[in-house]
Amino acid sequence: MNNEPLRPDPDRLLEQTAAPHRGKLKVFFGACAGVGKTWAMLAEAQRLRAQGLDIVVGVVETHGRKDTAAMLEGLAVLPLKRQAYRGRHISEFDLDAALARRPALILMDELAHSNAPGSRHPKRWQDIEELLEAGIDVFTTVNVQHLESLNDVVSGVTGIQVRETVPDPFFDAADDVVLVDLPPDDLRQRLKEGKVYIAGQAERAIEHFFRKGNLIALRELALRRTADRVDEQMRAWRGHPGEEKVWHTRDAILLCIGHNTGSEKLVRAAARLASRLGSVWHAVYVETPALHRLPEKKRRAILSALRLAQELGAETATLSDPAEEKAVVRYAREHNLGKIILGRPASRRWWRRETFADRLARIAPDLDQVLVALDEPPARTINNAPDNRSFKDKWRVQIQGCVVAAALCAVITLIAMQWLMAFDAANLVMLYLLGVVVVALFYGRWPSVVATVINVVSFDLFFIAPRGTLAVSDVQYLLTFAVMLTVGLVIGNLTAGVRYQARVARYREQRTRHLYEMSKALAVGRSPQDIAATSEQFIASTFHARSQVLLPDDNGKLQPLTHPQGMTPWDDAIAQWSFDKGLPAGAGTDTLPGVPYQILPLKSGEKTYGLVVVEPGNLRQLMIPEQQRLLETFTLLVANALERLTLTASEEQARMASEREQIRNALLAALSHDLRTPLTVLFGQAEILTLDLASEGSPHARQASEIRQHVLNTTRLVNNLLDMARIQSGGFNLKKEWLTLEEVVGSALQMLEPGLSSPINLSLPEPLTLIHVDGPLFERVLINLLENAVKYAGAQAEIGIDAHVEGENLQLDVWDNGPGLPPGQEQTIFDKFARGNKESAVPGVGLGLAICRAIVDVHGGTITAFNRPEGGACFRVTLPQQTAPELEEFHEDM
């Protein structure tokens, strides 16, 4: 094969060398619970145990399934570690015992499981990571909804937010992933038969999470995720040394763009084919020594075709190789592209016996070719209007080269005439060939052709008898002339090609040096002005162009950072359009192409940070594909530098905000501590005074009761300040326990009973609804929400608490029929020190709802606010429901 072998990736070889020291991870992957992941894992473990492998069961959840429990027979089970937590004993995986036991393989069910507080790692996947680092192989299971990248997608489909997730990099790093699949109808039948959940849970699951539409969507996500992983494995394997053939595992298209007319038709045909096949496609153009002979019009057509391909979804590249077919085949093999799309001109010149398609088929017969007919014949190079000046400049150089060629031939002839007596005439041919090489080296192909012809004529006139005429006395000299002409043409052509390759190499070295120097200069920039000055300096030196960097001000209006002299004023409307759309405008684009400048957006990722306006001295030089690609790379470097400044500024603001918050919390905590003791004493004295005056029947008993109530309100405010400071500093431990919802609500109502003028409407689910919460903290949430309703809805307003279980979540609403929330403040009302109506006479500092959100967040839930259609406000708390303990265990804990 004519292609050079691909060199192995050193990083990949290092990874392969280090791989055997780490345990292997095998993931049994499924769409949802009940598809048979655990059973498949145990079946594989039983097969390996029969082969003599040392296997230990670390954690396997049978969920009461008899067939799953039966698969555990014969397997060694590692005892779970029981640890005390708030008076209860929780069983968790014993990581230290597993490391001490060091089996060859350990089974770890439910990869996304969250460990109990006090464990070494908060997540089970972190336990597995430590096992792998110790060289122990691991089998585990996970559902698609637990992958971090798909968590939002799944919640959008099912309406249920899954809290336990696994980072995608950990899943992707698994050595093997086994997809365990089950059709939705079969899975629903298993649910009905009680093979997944117990009867009551199964009925609710079928109506909510396990709806057929949900199962189909989850199944598609699991299949796609597995297919993407398999495709990535195939690509990684193809990177191994020696894998050079294209694998036709899926349709992938490579479009070859030439300099013939009709390239845009070719691009559109490739895009249509890729769309029908649902495949990826690439578009490439190969730079050859012939490129420098193309007129600027054709170069712009090549650039336009590459841009069109990129707009239509292709990955574009510009290759460089004297042999086009070798570059195309090498690129196709590197990217596993099995279909090559080529343009077939309408006519074929008689002297071209082998076309590009023929050469491609000869060196790569395994690649499929798709030929697209070009309606127009190959365009000839004509000096028409837009390129007259450029062609004149080129012809001026060519004519100068021809004059130099003639002069050099004359000098060689004079020297050879002096040496004629010492050397044979045939040996003087070498001098003429040397002249051809010199002309080709400095002036290119056509002057070397002229030099070759003049040399042959001069040799005949001055050195072959009869001298002074073109006639020859010996027919053998005709062969000498033919060889001399042929060798001269070949040497001239080869020398011109070498000259072009040297020029290309010099250009690439210069381009690389400019990119390196620019990136180094941008890296030390500390302000947008530094970035703008650096970019304008390098654009001026590289492209011989003036430029301006435009950045948006606080109002979004684009403003220049510098004011270079002599630039054409740019159009504000077009610049704003380019910034808003993130698309280039001006010369060489489809938007305002007649202006003498080009506007390029400074984009990094999906965000546009500004614009750069470039006005070159020679617009044609800027329009050639190589220069355009270099300019686009420059703009990307500038955008990355601006992004770095933005991120640095955001980080600094966040740091300062955090420091301010810490100081404020410390001040509030200190102030609240100083106030708590006198308030406690004052409340006690007010309580005694109220009771004494009431027992005496004093008319001042009412005033004493008001004093007591105001002291109580102030005490609650101080407690809120302390709680917020404690939550923000992280200085509290969440002490969850199993409580009934009725108990928590009743306790909160009892605390507020003196301040409630009317009873609360309650609508709670069936008795003994268990919630896993920190009792005092969650009571504080209900107290704050009810106090908020009493304050803003009025003492005579109707207030209620509704609760119901929806799927895997408990939804609790605290509502009233008061004036409702101010429009647009449904989210900001939960901020610290935020109040719905700042001019309101209702006392308070705006901490109650902020504390509610903080407490709900640490419980893994959410809290939202909205106005009810029938009037009034509603605050909704959503908590994830965990599997409740068995009733007997619950009574023991109670």
From Swiss-Prot:
GO terms for molecular function: ATP binding; phosphorelay sensor kinase activity; protein homodimerization activity; transferase activity, transferring phosphorus-containing groups. Its EC number is 2.7.13.3. Member of the two-component regulatory system KdpD/KdpE involved in the regulation of the kdp operon. KdpD may function as a membrane-associated protein kinase that phosphorylates KdpE in response to environmental signals. InterPro entries: GAF (IPR003018), GAF-like_dom_sf (IPR029016), HATPase_C_sf (IPR036890), His_kinase_dom (IPR005467), HisK_dim/P_dom (IPR003661), HisK_dim/P_sf (IPR036097), Histidine_kinase_KdpD (IPR052023), KdpD_sf (IPR038318). It is found in: Cell inner membrane. It is a multi-pass membrane protein. Its main location: membrane. GO terms for biological process: cellular response to potassium ion; signal transduction. Residues 424-427, 467-474 are periplasmic. Keywords: ATP-binding, Cell inner membrane, Cell membrane, Kinase, Membrane, Nucleotide-binding, Phosphoprotein, Transferase, Transmembrane, Transmembrane helix, Two-component regulatory system. The lineage of its organism: Bacteria, Pseudomonadati, Pseudomonadota, Gammaproteobacteria, Enterobacterales. It catalyses: ATP + protein L-histidine = ADP + protein N-phospho-L-histidine. Pfam families: DUF4118 (PF13493), GAF_3 (PF13492), HATPase_c (PF02518), HisKA (PF00512), KdpD (PF02702). The chain crosses the membrane at residues 401-423, 428-444, 446-466, 475-498. Residues 670-883 form the Histidine kinase domain. GO terms for cellular component: cytosol; outer membrane-bounded periplasmic space; plasma membrane. Residues 1-400, 445, 499-894 are cytoplasmic. In the central section; belongs to the universal stress protein A family. The modification Phosphohistidine is found at residue 673. This is Sensor protein KdpD.
